[in-house]
């Protein structure tokens, strides 16, 4: 009896223990379910931010702009950014970020529009065509440019799917472009007009003034009106990466530590290890680098041998201490060096001053021509006329351009507007372009022989249209009502100048 009761008791203990284990596992399972279905989906939003899930691309009204990593848009941004970097180099006044982002956005919009067309017209690709193109995918090619099964097998399933999807999309988009081009049907009258345009010529004379024609007298006059900008001082400086180092160095200078010794200790400038190098600096030079105007004025109040307090560099958390190796020199109108520095300043920061002067000079020339012979006025202003032949090859490369020295204007709508807006034996207004100011005179309107016209084939015109209209496809898809206007704007030369 005791054995039975002990067994029952033991069984109850085991059962209770099992129930406890089941209860604990049940609670654990419940926690996992709650975590998996409720909390986990929220975690990316809780812990992730734009820095970890996307790429920063500039800002708008102080708010950062982010876009998804590895997306097609990101690929376009990267492509156009690299392209701008190569083309522009270190060119100033070019917002590379904005231009790259804008072009990437337009390309992305074009892709969306193409995709809609693909769906609307049920475009498809044959398996044979797709496989043929996949075999040429760069990811699968060896160093000789041949398909490599080894490289194919090395690619992950994810990579293969991505390559496949990209290939399908690219081929479909190519087919859409062919579809659009084949549906842009041009009337024969358009081809005839382009052929007739090949015979149109404008024979012009022109003269020009460049920045080099901005006289020293004008340079001196500008400097004397802005004397403060062109004060000059011989300076050496030590750059510090933080304010603490700058203060420590300044205290040492106050305690008679030689400036040269501190330069060797703190400066990253290798030249300072050979001794302090002093350079002549103009007020406008330092105005570009010093953050506060009062600091700038304090530098130009230094006497020879004196040093400044730590001065913050503009747009950086760095500081400089300057030492004067001369007293301040005012602008000297007899100094070629000072005159050259002022002229360089005006060319760089105030080009409108030069252009305004040159425009006024050519306007005076036009005024004198009304009352004197052309040869006399040319001699008075020490100018000479050059000649050019202008034809209508703007934006349409179906026949050769006739421009020579003015070839830089071969795609300038403003230039063509002026030339084809002139009447025979009349002068244009001053025209500013490329650091020069021009005057154009229309000698005559002539027609070339029909030989060139007869050599132009419709197929060549169509080929050029298909190339040139690629930029109009988006407009065609998104703004059909504006297509005609956009077309005429892009093909400026299609205006019927032959009737003028």
UniProtKB/Swiss-Prot annotation:
Q: Which residues form a coiled coil?
A: none
Provenance organism: Borreliella burgdorferi (strain ATCC 35210 / DSM 4680 / CIP 102532 / B31) (Borrelia burgdorferi)
Mark the transmembrane ranges: 27-47
Q: Where in the cell is it found?
A: Membrane
Q: What keywords were assigned to this record?
A: Membrane, Transmembrane, Transmembrane helix
**Lineage per the UniProt record:** Bacteria, Pseudomonadati, Spirochaetota, Spirochaetia, Spirochaetales
- InterPro entries, per this entry? PPIase_dom_sf
Gene Ontology annotations for the cellular component aspect, listed alphabetically: membrane
Return the protein name.
Uncharacterized protein BB_0039
Say yes or no: keyword Electron transport present: no
Question: Under the GO molecular function aspect, what terms does this record hold?
Answer: peptidyl-prolyl cis-trans isomerase activity
Domain of life of the source = Bacteria
Membrane topology is: Single-pass membrane protein
């Amino acid at each position: 009896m005791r054995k039975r009761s002990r067994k029952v008791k033991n069984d109850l203990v085991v059962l209770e223990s099992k129930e406890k284990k089941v209860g604990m596992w049940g609670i654990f399972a419940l926690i996992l379910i709650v975590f998996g279905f409720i909390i986990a989906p929220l975690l990316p939003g809780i812990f992730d931010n734009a820095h970890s899930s996307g790429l920063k691309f500039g800002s708008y009204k102080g708010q950062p702009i982010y876009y998804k990593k590895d997306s097609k848009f990101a690929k376009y941004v990267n492509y156009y950014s690299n392209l701008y970097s190569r083309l522009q180099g270190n060119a100033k006044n070019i917002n590379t970020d904005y231009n790259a982002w804008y072009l990437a956005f337009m390309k992305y919009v074009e892709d969306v529009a193409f995709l809609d067309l693909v769906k609307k017209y049920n475009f498809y690709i044959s398996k044979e065509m797709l496989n043929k193109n996949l075999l040429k995918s760069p990811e699968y090619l060896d160093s000789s440019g041949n398909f490599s099964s080894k490289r194919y097998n090395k690619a992950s399933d994810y990579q293969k799917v991505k390559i496949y999807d990209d290939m399908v999309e690219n081929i479909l988009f190519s087919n859409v472009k062919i579809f659009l081009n084949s549906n842009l049907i041009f009337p024969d009258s358009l081809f005839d007009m382009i052929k007739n345009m090949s015979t149109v010529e404008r024979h012009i004379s022109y003269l020009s003034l460049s920045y080099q024609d901005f006289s020293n007298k004008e340079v001196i006059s500008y400097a004397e009106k802005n004397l403060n900008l062109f004060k000059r001082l011989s300076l050496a400086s030590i750059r510090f990466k933080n304010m603490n180092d700058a203060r420590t160095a300044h205290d040492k200078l106050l305690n008679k530590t030689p400036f040269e010794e501190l330069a060797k200790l703190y400066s990253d400038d290798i030249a300072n290890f050979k001794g302090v190098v002093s350079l002549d600096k103009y007020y406008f030079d330092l105005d570009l680098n010093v953050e506060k105007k009062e600091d700038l004025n304090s530098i130009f109040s230094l006497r020879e041998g004196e040093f400044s307090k730590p001065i913050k560099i503009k747009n950086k958390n760095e500081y400089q201490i300057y030492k004067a190796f001369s007293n301040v020199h005012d602008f000297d109108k007899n100094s070629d060096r000072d005159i050259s520095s002022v002229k360089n300043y005006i060319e760089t920061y105030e080009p409108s001053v030069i252009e305004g002067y040159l425009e006024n000079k050519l306007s005076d020339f036009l005024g004198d021509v009304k009352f004197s012979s052309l040869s006399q006025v040319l001699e008075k202003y020490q100018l000479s006329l050059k000649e050019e032949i202008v034809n209508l090859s703007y934006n349409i490369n179906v026949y050769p351009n006739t421009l020579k020295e003015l070839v830089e204007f071969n795609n300038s709508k403003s230039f063509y507007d002026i030339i084809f807006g002139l009447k025979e034996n009349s002068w244009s207004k001053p025209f500013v372009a490329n650091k020069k100011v021009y005057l154009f005179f229309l000698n005559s309107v002539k027609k070339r022989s029909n030989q060139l016209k007869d050599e132009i084939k419709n197929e060549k015109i169509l080929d050029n249209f298909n190339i040139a209209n690629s930029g109009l496809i988006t407009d065609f898809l998104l703004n059909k009502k504006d297509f005609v206007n956009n077309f005429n704007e892009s093909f400026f030369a299609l205006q019927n100048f032959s009737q003028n």
